[in-house]
A protein has these predicted regions:
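An amphipathic alpha-helix adjacent to DNA-recognition modules
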Residues: 22-30, 42-43, 62-87, 105
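C-terminal peripheral helix-coil segments that are non-catalytic and often amphipathic
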Residues: 1-11, 148-149, 179, 183-238
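Hydrophobic alpha-helical connector segments
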Residues: 73, 87-114
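Short hydrophobic/aromatic patch on the recognition helix
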Residues: 53-64
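Amphipathic alpha-helical segments used for helix-helix packing
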Residues: 105-130, 144, 179
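Short, hydrophobic secondary-structure boundary micro-motifs
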Residues: 45, 117-122, 155-156, 160, ...
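Basic, helix-initiating cap at the start of DNA-binding domains
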Residues: 1-48, 52
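Amphipathic alpha-helical packing segments from all-alpha helical-bundle domains
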Residues: 87, 127-178
Length: 238
């Protein structure tokens, strides 16, 4: 049986190549997302996925080495789709610092509202890795744009290294915020505000940071409504 050598073909090519083989892979990933959202990860099996995707058993192993691998691909696609929509939402925004903070709220919103959140919280390292691979390049681009636009003062392009290093800590802290939302301790915006004021997203004066946060808290975003079945989450009155 022919087996695809994943080492020879980039992941991006696997995802977007228009062919029968890539379509089968897409169907399997969609099936995995559907299953994870409805059943969680514990009972996922190859048999169940190929039935949902309506593909042959061997097709699974042409694309994935294990169930764990397709779980990562499923989360990868979910985050990538979110990022595409997020970039469209802010395409006309000129305040790049605002975009960096808004992305933090969007990440909390995405995870807190996904039906898969409980199994995702069991594998936080996987979540961190996916966000690092998918969203980090976009956040670095926004950071550089903010520096070039002088929206981050007294900063040079070389400080991007420090930003990269701090993002890892921020991602772990964001997972803690998601857990607080899931446990009912805070609303998404309350968790976001607490996190954004206590962990450095970017090195800017508190006054500038607080103004950006206040703007975000006052706004209502399309994905807030969509992800909460049409119910808006009230901003933190403080």
């Amino acid at each position: 049986m022919f087996k695809l050598n994943h080492e020879l073909i980039p992941k991006s090519l696997n995802l977007y190549t228009v062919s029968v083989m890539s379509r089968s892979k897409e169907k399997l990933i969609e099936a995995a997302i559907t299953y994870l959202n409805s059943e969680g990860a514990d009972k996922m099996s190859v048999n169940k996925l190929v039935d949902l995707a309506n593909v042959g058993y061997g097709t699974f192993y042409n694309h994935f080495a294990s169930i764990e691998e397709i779980q990562i691909e499923a989360l990868n696609k979910t985050v990538r789709d979110m990022l595409i929509n997020f970039k469209l939402d802010v395409r006309n925004e000129t305040d790049h610092v605002y975009v960096l903070y808004l992305a933090l709220l969007r990440g909390i919103n995405l995870l807190a509202n996904t039906p898969s959140i409980h199994w995702l919280l069991k594998d936080v390292q996987m979540v961190i890795q996916v966000f690092k691979e998918v969203s980090q390049p976009n956040m670095e681009s926004n950071y550089l744009n903010a520096v070039k636009a002088k929206q981050i003062k007294n900063t040079e392009i070389e400080d991007l290294i420090n930003f990269k290093n701090s993002r890892h800590y921020m991602q772990w802290a964001a997972i803690g915020a998601v857990e607080q939302v899931v446990n009912g301790e805070f609303t998404e915006k309350e968790a976001f505000e607490k996190l954004a004021k206590n962990v450095t997203v970017v090195d800017i004066p508190d006054k500038q940071r607080d103004a950006v946060i206040a703007r975000i808290l006052k706004e209502t975003h399309p994905w807030e409504i969509k992800d909460n079945d049409g119910k808006q989450i009230p901003s933190n009155p403080n």
